[in-house]
């Protein structure tokens, strides 16, 4: 019998690239940063200045020297909450319709529309 191809599931993400989020769990709890990258197949996000790890880079040519650099690594999307810069508070997100009938994201605590 032939094996079924396993297709990676794409998770619905409540954050988008460019959103300001606050980390709510883990070693970087309470840190605020901007979402750099979204990985929906893994349900993870990369946040600026969060989950920093040191990476040892090998030299590509003989004349070049190796180096140690710090890079942001992804964290699970359930560990971040959208953050309001106006009110300085993190909040869950809900979906609502604006006056023109377009579906937009809104912060539950403040009522601030994100999109």
Swiss-Prot record:
**Could you tell me which InterPro entries the record lists for this protein?**
KOW, Rib_uL2_dom2, Ribosomal_uL24, Ribosomal_uL24_KOW, Translation_prot_SH3-like_sf
Query: Which GO BP terms, alphabetically?
Result: translation
Q: Which GO terms describe its cellular component?
A: ribonucleoprotein complex; ribosome
Query: What is a GO molecular function of this protein?
Result: structural constituent of ribosome
> Quaternary structure?
Part of the 50S ribosomal subunit.
NCBIfam families linked to this entry: rplX_bact
Q: What is this protein called?
A: Large ribosomal subunit protein uL24
To which species is this protein native?
A: Acaryochloris marina (strain MBIC 11017)
